[in-house]
Amino acid sequence: MGRIRQTFIKRTGEELIEKFADKFTSDFEENKKAVEEVAMISTKTLRNRVAGYVTAKVKKMNA
């Protein structure tokens, strides 16, 4: 069983994937940098959670 992500993280991640799909890969470290570039996220923790969600989504789409 995994952790359930908050709606804000899911919504933000979905919007970023929709707008900037070409910037994201299945690598978390690269996605952290990409999220920092394209989104105005105030805290490191929130940035990492959004990047983790985006990474998981990209991995699912490529599988």
From Swiss-Prot:
Keywords: Ribonucleoprotein, Ribosomal protein. One of its GO terms (molecular function) is structural constituent of ribosome. One of its GO terms (cellular component) is ribonucleoprotein complex. Transmembrane segments: none annotated. PROSITE patterns: RIBOSOMAL_S17E. InterPro entries: Ribosomal_eS17 (IPR001210), Ribosomal_eS17_CS (IPR018273), Ribosomal_eS17_sf (IPR036401). Pfam families: Ribosomal_S17e (PF00833). GO terms for biological process: translation. SUPFAM superfamilies: Rps17e-like. PANTHER family: 40S RIBOSOMAL PROTEIN S17. Belongs to the eukaryotic ribosomal protein eS17 family. This is Small ribosomal subunit protein eS17. It comes from Methanococcus maripaludis (strain C5 / ATCC BAA-1333).
